[in-house]
């Protein structure tokens, strides 16, 4: 007999894990089974999709890094499903992971913002992070460049382009696309795992997305989010994305419903200012000559602020500033010319929330740690990490936890402590049964004789095996 989701919940109830209160209760609040049905993830036979995903969602909280690890741990008793059931789901190119992530994101907003109020600083935030891997046999893996690491920043992996939605209080991941960069040498490409996908399947479309450049990918993410009913006030990106075409496309969505606030490179691009056409450097010289430099005490920065004409877009506001201990001027752009410097910086600083989200996803929720060679399994792994992030984010907002890290540590510590207590209790129960059997058989127990019996040796072996297991699991 297979177990359904309610039976998994009963197992966790019996163990008294905090994970039950946090994950199973949140899944119930989200009505996760219905969300899976809405996303079109119905299976014809066997275990239900929501049952399998429920197991996968719990992996980071059970400190398990793979399906294989589940069946070598004490947690295997949580379910009777075979590991091939989980592998088949992760490797299935037909699964609409993107649709499922949107269903969870919509439900999250429905729960935390039932009035559907749009905050003044609500924003789409687009940024990328490197999912580093060891080896080159994983499907579609390439050499990617980490600009933070500089010249030595090339490594095997993927660029994970993520769209986050900031609702005024917290960020939630809406969508993502995995991108490849520099192709590997021909010899290494031959050794890579290759999979033939059904044309126009979800997995096939994901592979096509991976070949697109990041600016095109970012625009697709934003337009898809708007179609799914998300429409914030601003779009926040760094200077890498702010090409002329990108800005024009953002302003063209819903007749200019969203404004762009972004960093922009101080390069060759020209701006119209007081009848002159100037690039960034000449504009700084002109503004300095006019004595328009200001100082902001709140941010401890010197800056210029002016409205210019950007060909192909119209009037925009530029903010040219130099932070303490920096030699170069940094330039920010806003298509909302009503924003002063302080307000612009307050809105742009919201972009930092996506960096915090990346850190929490990688540090606690196993983002980028999928060990499978199958590209579909990589997509599944990222999606599940983001779903778990929203579950924990909802619990945190409802229970006033300050950080995701603090919440995760609470779950992990409680889980490990109660798991150890449960194992010791099961051991004691088994030992007690052995002693009862001996007494029942002999009527009484002679201690010296008992120490030489098979039952005593069995008890000793149980203890040694249990504590050795505890020790290795704590390493």
Regions found by a protein language model. Name each.
Residues 1-47, 77-78, 180-182, 187, ...:
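A short, flexible helix-boundary coil/loop motif
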Residues 3, 91-183, 187-192, 302-305:
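Active-site-proximal, Lys/Arg-enriched surface segment
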Residues 33-47, 63-136, 140-143, 242, ...:
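Electropositive nucleic-acid engagement tracts
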Residues 50-64:
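Short, amphipathic alpha-helical "recognition" segments used to contact nucleic acids or chromatin
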Residues 63-65, 84-85, 148-232, 311, ...:
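Electropositive, glycine- and tryptophan-enriched low-complexity nucleic-acid-binding patches
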Residues 195-275:
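Domain-level cores of phosphate- or acyl-group-handling catalytic modules
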């Amino acid at each position: 007999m297979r177990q359904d989701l309610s039976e998994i919940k009963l197992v966790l109830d019996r163990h008294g894990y905090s994970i039950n209160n946090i994950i199973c209760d949140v899944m119930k609040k989200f009505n996760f089974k219905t969300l899976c049905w809405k996303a079109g993830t119905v299976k014809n036979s066997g275990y239900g999709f929501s049952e399998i995903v429920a197991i996968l969602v719990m992996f980071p909280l059970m400190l398990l890094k793979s399906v294989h690890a589940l069946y070598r741990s004490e947690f295997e008793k949580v379910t009777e499903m075979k590991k091939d059931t989980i592998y088949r789901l992760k490797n299935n190119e037909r699964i609409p992971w993107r649709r499922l992530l949107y269903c969870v994101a919509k439900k999250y907003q429905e729960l935390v913002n039932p009035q559907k109020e749009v905050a003044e600083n609500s924003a789409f935030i687009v940024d990328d992070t490197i999912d580093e891997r060891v080896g080159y046999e994983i499907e579609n893996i390439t050499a990617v460049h980490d600009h933070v690491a500089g010249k030595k920043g090339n490594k095997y992996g993927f660029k994970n382009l993520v769209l986050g939605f900031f609702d005024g209080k917290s960020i939630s991941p809406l969508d993502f696309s995995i991108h490849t960069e520099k192709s590997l040498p021909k010899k290494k490409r031959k050794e890579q795992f290759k999979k033939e996908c059904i044309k126009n399947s979800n997995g096939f479309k994901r592979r096509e997305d991976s070949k697109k450049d990041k600016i095109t990918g970012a625009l697709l993410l934003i337009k898809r989010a708007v179609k799914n009913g998300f429409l914030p006030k601003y779009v926040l990106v760094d200077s890498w994305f702010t090409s002329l075409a990108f800005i024009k496309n953002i302003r063209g969505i819903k007749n200019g419903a969203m404004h762009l606030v972004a960093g922009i490179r101080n390069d060759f691009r020209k701006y119209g200012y007081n009848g002159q056409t100037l690039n960034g450097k000449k504009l700084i010289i002109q503004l300095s000559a006019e004595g328009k430099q200001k100082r902001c005490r709140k941010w401890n920065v010197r800056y210029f602020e002016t409205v210019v004409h950007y060909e192909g877009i119209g009037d925009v506001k530029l903010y040219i500033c130099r932070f303490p201990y920096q030699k170069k001027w940094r330039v920010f752009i806003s298509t909302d010319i009503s924003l002063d410097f302080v307000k612009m910086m307050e809105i742009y600083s919201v972009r930092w929330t996506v960096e915090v989200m990346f850190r929490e996803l990688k540090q606690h929720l196993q983002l980028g740690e999928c060990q499978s060679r199958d590209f579909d399994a990589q997509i599944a792994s990222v999606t599940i990490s983001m779903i778990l992030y929203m579950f924990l984010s909802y619990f945190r907002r409802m229970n006033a936890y300050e950080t995701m890290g603090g919440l995760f540590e609470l779950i992990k510590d409680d889980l490990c402590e109660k798991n150890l207590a449960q194992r010791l209790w099961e051991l004691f129960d088994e030992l007690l049964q052995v002693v009862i059997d001996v007494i029942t058989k002999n009527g009484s127990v002679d201690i010296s004789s008992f120490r030489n019996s098979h039952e005593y040796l069995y008890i000793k072996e149980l203890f040694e095996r249990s504590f050795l297991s505890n020790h290795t699991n704590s390493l």
